[in-house]
Each structure stands twice: as structure tokens, then as C-alpha cells.
Amino acid sequence: GFIGYGAVFEADGVVVDNYSVRSNNGQAMFWTNPSVNAQVNALAGYDLVILQYGLNIMQTGVHNYTNYARQIEKMVVYVQQCFPTAAVLVLGVSDRSVKTDTGFEPMDAIPYMLDYQRGAAENTGAAFWPTCDAMRSLGGMEQFVANGWAGKDYTHINYAGGRRVAWSLVDAI
């Protein structure tokens, strides 16, 4: 039978396709068919593929993400094979805070995860952008929550927060 991945109704200009699967660590992309991806790429002509994973994998006190970095490298290579004319950008994890006796503070795993993500991007020739740094330049997760730009879980930004981060990314590009 027919399996549809989307429909195209856009005019010329910048078009963003979001292939989002909640609570996905990136492994779902390997379930996609490379030949179908190549056909989609032939029709859409992607210039850039952005990968953003890792936020829910981090744990307080965990500083070694070697195995995860290998998975990131596999994901980047897979995307490069499916979309050979597109650049690949790995977004580093966003800011995330944890509750302490004195309030909320940034999760200690963030700099370690960022280092592993940055290394995986470098090892595969992908670009890297640290989302966390952009959020912290806007006040960090505590300010995002206070402004209503993130959930009270101090982990996930919402549409309003995403808009601010997106403009930071546009400025960086």
C-alpha cells in the first residue's frame, strides 16, 4: 500500500521540514529506507539537515557519553549517505536544570555531553552549534521558565523558547 511522508505545498524560499518523533534518541532514522530518502532528496533538494538529540539521555553525575557519541557519528554518516548534497548540523543539547536544596542549577552533565557531541560532529565533518550557549546568553533555563519559554520540568523549551533559540541559530548562521 501507499505510505506517505508528507506533502509539498510551499512556494520558493526557505522551507523547513521537521521530522519529529518525541522521546526519540535518533535511532528511528535507521528505520527509514535510504532509497526513499534519496527520492525525497531528489524532489526536495535539501541543503541542510539538522540533528538534535541527547537532552533526555543526560543524567546527573554521568560524564561519559562515549557510546552515545558513536551513535551520533552513525546518524551523521547515515544522513550524509541519504542526503549527499546537504550539509549536516549537529545541535548540542539545550540548557537543562535540576532541583537542588537551594533551587535549580544547570545539570552537571551538560558540558560533557556537549564535548561528546562536538567531537562526533568534528569526526564526521558535520557542523556543530551549542544550543545551551544560546539559551544561556538569554538567561539560561531558569530565565526561560520564568518567561514562560520552557516547561516547569526545567528540561524542555516550548514554542516561545524555541523561537528565541531559532533566532539565535539564524544569527549564528
Located regions from the model:
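Active-site neighborhood of glycoside hydrolase catalytic domains
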Residues: M75-C82, W167-S168, A172
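Catalytic His-Asp segment of secreted/periplasmic serine-dependent ester chemistry enzymes
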Residues: P34, D95-I173
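Short, conserved SAM-binding segment of the class I
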Residues: Q71-Y78, Y116, A120
